[in-house]
Amino acid sequence: MNRIARRFLGSTLGLILLAGPAMAQPKADPDWPCVQRKVATLSPGQFWTGPDIAAAGDWGSDNDAAVLAQKIASRRTDLSQVGPLLDDFSSKFGSDKDAKDKALTRVYAGVFEVINGERDKVVGGIARYSQGQRRMAERIRDEADKISQTKDAPSATDATELPKDQSELETKFAWDRRIFQERSQSLTYVCEVPQLLEQRLGEIARMIQAKL
């Protein structure tokens, strides 16, 4: 076997390990590659101890609440801006505490729906990403097997140059391996996103409840 092939094949075990915990260890969901525990979706009550959400009315029917909810739910809005935005919104109700509390509850309902919807999409995307990585890992293993088979080929011992088809296979193997590793590194960050969104939702819920 030539030196290039040996080097690549010697790193195959490391490649498999890079596939992520879900590919190396049994999981409840084989398509979940993250070390973080999978929570498929969230519920409003996880973060809210304020007034009844249903009794406050449909947040989408309250234009002011909907605009604010979408603004503060967006990750483009820094959390340091949320408090002042809530203060401005609350000031519109003067001394009418009941109206203010219901409006703020609608704001929370909107924030929850926006962030949870974004989070659901991320979780679904991670599953599809994991499936793609698994398929690529299988393809790379197949390529490695084909390269290793040349070791026993009749012409392998005396050959001074790689046959064209073998050279192309090793080039493809190296390229696929590089792509796989880069995607594995990206997955580490992507896996953090659902938890970051949960944290943002929890912090905004706390800020809203502090204004009640």
Regions found by a protein language model. Give the residues of each.
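Surface-exposed polar/charged interaction patches
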Residues: 75, 92-96, 114-117, 132, ...
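N-terminal Sec/ER secretory leader and immediately downstream segment
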Residues: 24-101
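Long amphipathic alpha-helices with heptad-repeat character
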Residues: 79, 126-129, 133-143, 147, ...
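Bacterial N-terminal signal peptides
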Residues: 10-20
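Alpha-helical oligomerization segments
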Residues: 156-212
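Bacterial N-terminal signal peptides that target proteins for export
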Residues: 1-11
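Extended, amphipathic alpha-helical coiled-coil scaffold segments used for oligomerization/tethering
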Residues: 102-109, 113, 134-177, 181
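Short, charge-rich amphipathic alpha-helices with coiled-coil/heptad character
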Residues: 94-126
